[in-house]
Amino acid sequence: MQKDASLSGFLPSFQHFATQAIHVGQEPEQWNSRAVVLPISLATTFKQDFPGQSSGFEYSRSGNPTRNCLEKAVAALDGAKHSLAFASGLAATITITHLLKAGDEIICMDEVYGGTNRYFRRVASEFGLKISFVDCSKTKLLEAAITPQTKLVWIETPTNPTLKLADIGACAQIVHKRGDIILVVDNTFMSAYFQRPLALGADICMCSATKYMNGHSDVVMGLVSVNSDDLNSRLRFLQNSLGAVPSPFDCYLCCRGLKTLQVRMEKHFKNGMAVARFLETNPRVEKVVYPGLPSHPQHELAKRQCSGCPGMVSFYIKGALQHAKAFLKNLKLFTLAESLGGYESLAELPAIMTHASVPEKDRATLGINDTLIRLSVGLEDEQDLLEDLDRALKAAHP
């Protein structure tokens, strides 16, 4: 699919993406039946030829044929050597964190998904890990924050929900001045289609596949991709030891979702841009935040490290909390719900929904106030989306 001329200026799409999404790890020749659709292997245990001699699978937690196919496909799409699937995005986060030991320090982007913030702040810190929250979009702050105890840097780009970007390459240069710090990039918002963190210098690319990678709001899953054989070996040991693996059925569904990732993301980009432009010219809107708009302070960075933008659009409605609630109440096509990245359009109020667990003082500093609304723009007809937003804005501000 060719990008609309008005959406140009970003990196070119990654070569062979759709072909790899459809075929890698799913070759019919690997099945006796020659099935062209990935079979679902529900078996929990597998017959061994001799005691202690398996044919590649022993117990489904340790390895499953359907999960293996998904992991091969994701590795290809992330431009990675290895990929691992987990039961959720947070399960992936927890497993990565187990690479560390008590006394180590994590530097985390100051603005991240609320669940990530909660896990680092209230759970990981209880196990002897030091957590520092830093605005990694400012590389000087990142460099100043690194201590001898720093072992992992966690960045999210774009951030959730204010869509702030971090320069992955610049962060990697700073982090890798020391040979013992792991750089993790949460790629949930961009997906493998629009951004490849490993190619930009990250050590680990992770995402919540619940969102764009699966894209149908019917799977909870996390994905982790790496190029390092050592990191892959350590993470696979933890994947098996901690046991937070997805079901074979969910792996099948995610594989199916990947096959349409390219066409979905192109449509999300088109619709997201249309919504952002509409909101930016609306008198009832205070400010729009979308990396695809020239008005975004890091628009040029987005064009340098991404091949496009997803359907995530955040904006500040004029007025106060009552106006934000009125707007959300009067939406008909957009569904009031958490999560994102599905084919259906969603709207939410981060301050009291997805980011309610973030301390109020931190929310205020980050700009997550009572008038910030986050949209996950879906695949519906563009005009229908714009009319729904226009109607709800007029209802909030008669």
From Swiss-Prot:
Show the catalytic activity. L,L-cystathionine + H2O = 2-oxobutanoate + L-cysteine + NH4(+); L-cysteine + H2O = hydrogen sulfide + pyruvate + NH4(+) + H(+); L-homocysteine + H2O = 2-oxobutanoate + hydrogen sulfide + NH4(+) + H(+); L-homoserine = 2-oxobutanoate + NH4(+)
PROSITE patterns from the xrefs?
CYS_MET_METAB_PP
Q: Where does substrate bind?
A: 61, 113, 118, 338
**Activity regulation, free text:** Activated by calmodulin in the presence of calcium ions.
Tell me the keywords, alphabetical order: Amino-acid biosynthesis, Calmodulin-binding, Cysteine biosynthesis, Cytoplasm, Lipid metabolism, Lyase, Pyridoxal phosphate
- GO MF, any single term: identical protein binding
Protein name, please?
A: Cystathionine gamma-lyase
Q: Which organism is it from?
A: Mus musculus (Mouse)
